[in-house]
């Protein structure tokens, strides 16, 4: 059930006006998504973003628990920290427990490349590579990425499906629907709906063909 693993939040950062004499105060954003499989809530995805001057720090936490007849059949836990400066990734760290399989990813930036240690294996990436952690809508404009869980390289293809009206928690949203998929490994696929620049729903299909939705509270 690898495809249940979710790091689903896409958010747009507000513009922070700079003061004439003093640095702009940090802007902080907190969002929570409820993850639902069928009629059952199976987890949450939370994100905290702090934008201060030219630096953005991001903390993502995802918890998923699937139970069958009151017995836990699957658990997924993921934490991720990112630091961006002037639009460039400078540090990344994630820890994942995918139903007992654990991963540790650390990325640092050098002047002309990114240096990654993924589960004890070292590799170098171009500076254009970025984690497909889905907290920024910029993901639909980039195709060179890596899996935030495993560090696996990904090439993202985006399909523009068009406009749709969705009702979430009783509130109608005029949304734009995109599909994104990894063309290298083929395992990663998501449907994303935005109201303006803000993600309101994500859908994936589980390995058992169940529909899994992540809706903004």
For the regions a language model picked out, list residue spans one by one:
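Positively charged n-region of N-terminal signal peptides that target proteins for export
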Residues: 1-4
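Hydrophobic h-region of N-terminal signal peptides that target proteins for export
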Residues: 10-18
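Acidic, serine/threonine-rich low-complexity disordered tracts
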Residues: 20-111, 117-120, 125-217
């Amino acid at each position: 059930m690898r495809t249940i693993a979710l790091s689903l939040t896409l958010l747009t950062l507000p513009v922070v006006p700079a003061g004439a004499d003093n640095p702009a105060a940090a802007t902080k954003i907190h969002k929570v998504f409820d993850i639902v499989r069928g009629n059952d809530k199976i987890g949450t995805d939370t994100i905290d973003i702090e934008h201060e001057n030219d630096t953005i720090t991001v903390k993502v936490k995802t918890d998923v628990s699937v139970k069958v007849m009151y017995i836990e059949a699957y658990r997924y836990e993921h934490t991720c920290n990112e630091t961006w400066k002037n639009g460039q990734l400078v540090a990344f760290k994630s820890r994942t427990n995918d139903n007992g399989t654990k991963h540790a990813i650390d990325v640092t930036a050098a002047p002309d490349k990114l240096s990654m240690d993924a589960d004890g294996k070292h590799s170098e990436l171009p500076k254009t590579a970025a984690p497909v952690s889905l907290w920024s809508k910029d993901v639909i404009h980039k195709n060179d990425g890596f899996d935030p869980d495993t560090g696996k390289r990904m090439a993202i293809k985006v399909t523009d499906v068009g406009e749709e009206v969705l009702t979430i928690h009783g509130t109608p949203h005029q949304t734009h629907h995109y599909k994104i998929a990894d063309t290298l490994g083929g395992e990663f696929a998501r449907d994303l709906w935005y109201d303006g620049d803000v993600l309101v729903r994500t859908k994936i299909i589980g390995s058992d063909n169940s529909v899994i939705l992540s809706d903004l509270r």
